[in-house]
């Protein structure tokens, strides 16, 4: 009961953001069920839309200040990257009380199905996720990899060449960036 009371009355927005991905995996089934109920009730709570928008924007700004991109291809931390995508998803989940899936790709698809995200959002997020994995293998410094590695990355991602990869990445970041840039007014409506 103390956890439920804390979540209802005292928890900060960032704590509720973390709950959007929570999934009890250990313990007695009764206890896991009770925890799942508390999480679901917490996530479904009505929220002050202006406060949510303010908190989300401040958190992302603080993160950008304290953890800047490490290179030209840091698709996780660059504007329009995976962190922006995650903030968009979680902000919409908390504001509208729906699409709660611990897996971000499934959450994005659910938000698309409800009309809260555009069709291109999930493919953009998926491309950046696949690129992030590939770059960690061939360019861990998040800089442009050597030409032989560029060809490997392009092929693995289903593109003819590196230029196509970069064009698709720019388009994906544009989609995510547009959603992030428009998040505050959408949360307040």
What are these regions (language model features)?
Residues 1-189:
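A nucleotide- and high-energy phosphate-metabolite-utilizing enzyme signature
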């Amino acid at each position: 009961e103390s956890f439920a009371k804390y979540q209802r009355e005292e928890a900060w927005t960032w704590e509720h953001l973390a709950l959007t991905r929570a999934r009890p995996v250990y313990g007695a089934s009764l206890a896991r069920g009770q925890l799942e109920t508390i999480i679901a009730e917490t996530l479904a709570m009505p929220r002050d839309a202006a406060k949510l928008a303010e908190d989300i924007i401040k958190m992302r700004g603080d993160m950008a200040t304290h953890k800047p991109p490490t290179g030209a291809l840091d698709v996780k931390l660059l504007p329009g990257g995976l962190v922006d995508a995650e903030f968009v998803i979680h902000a919409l989940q908390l504001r509208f009380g729906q699409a709660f899936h611990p897996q971000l790709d499934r959450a994005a698809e659910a938000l698309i199905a409800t009309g809260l995200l555009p069709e291109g959002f999930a493919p953009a997020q998926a491309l950046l996720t696949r690129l992030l994995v590939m770059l960690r293998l061939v360019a861990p410094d998040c800089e442009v990899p050597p030409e032989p590695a560029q060809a490997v990355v392009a092929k693995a991602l289903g593109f003819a060449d590196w230029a196509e990869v970069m064009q698709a990445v720019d388009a994906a970041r544009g989609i995510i960036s547009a959603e992030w840039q428009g998040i505050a007014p959408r949360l307040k409506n």
